Amino acid sequence: MVAGAIEDTPREPDLTAARPGSSIRDTRGDRIFNAVNYVVLSIYLLIVLYPLVYIISASFSSPAAVTSGLVRLWPVDPTAIAYETIFKDPAIVRGFLNSIFYATVGTALNVTLTLLAAYPLSRKDLHGRGAIMVFFFFTTLFSGGLIPTYLVVRDLGLLNTRWALIVPAALSVWNVIITRTYFQSTIPDELHDAATIDGANDFRFLRDVVLPLSGPIIAVNALFYAVGHWNAYFDALIYLNDESLYPLQLVLRQILVQNQTNLKMTGDIQSMLARENLADLLKYALIVVATVPLLLVYPFVQKHFVKGALIGSLKG
């Protein structure tokens, strides 16, 4: 009787046979939804990827092919004449080195100041942190203006120096807010209490506990600041007169303007057409030269970027 009762007991359906690695069977609607997602995302990928492929292909094509519109996907009459023309100018190498300096030194200073500002503001026992945050946030609503900022930079003795592109943009309030929110969401008060009992002060706690746990938000800040420094153009145009201090973006602008000026001064029609074709080709090569360094850096911080950006901006 017992055996019969056990056999008559209804059994739960075996859902593990639905599909490997899942206990939930996809419905027809789920499959349609997934298919539509794949199609839409694939189309979006092609829309985003094609301009990049086209620019790279055009930069390696012949000037005549680019001007005639023969380049579609792959290089036509492959040549590296555009890159040879660019890197013959020593100003390009100097601009690269200057941009690397601005990006590395500036980013290191930016991240350091951001962490030192965000950590105290994340502590509930900081007296007056609400008023401090009001002052921080006020600067995001009202700026000092172009001319007053220029006068401040001049009076500080930073004009026409490398620090003119680093010190005025040493801190981003938005990044401070994101970092503060990250600390509040991921660093529990109990961890600070335990470190205090062990005799650690705030600086030691920040160095030995907070920083090792803050890899994602540090990567987010570093990427934001590095991209800003690498693309710096307007500040350099205002504060720098010495061409040896120009960042890459300003050097590339000079090359384009110089080619256009030389083109207008050319008297021979055939020479003018040749230089016009080369000028069009240089535009694509210059885009590649200015963009590739950032594309090479991003994959190394991508895994931290998504986590840090989401936690820092959504929680808290």
Where in the sequence are the language-model features?
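A hydrophobic, multi-pass inner-membrane permease signature
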Residues: 2-316
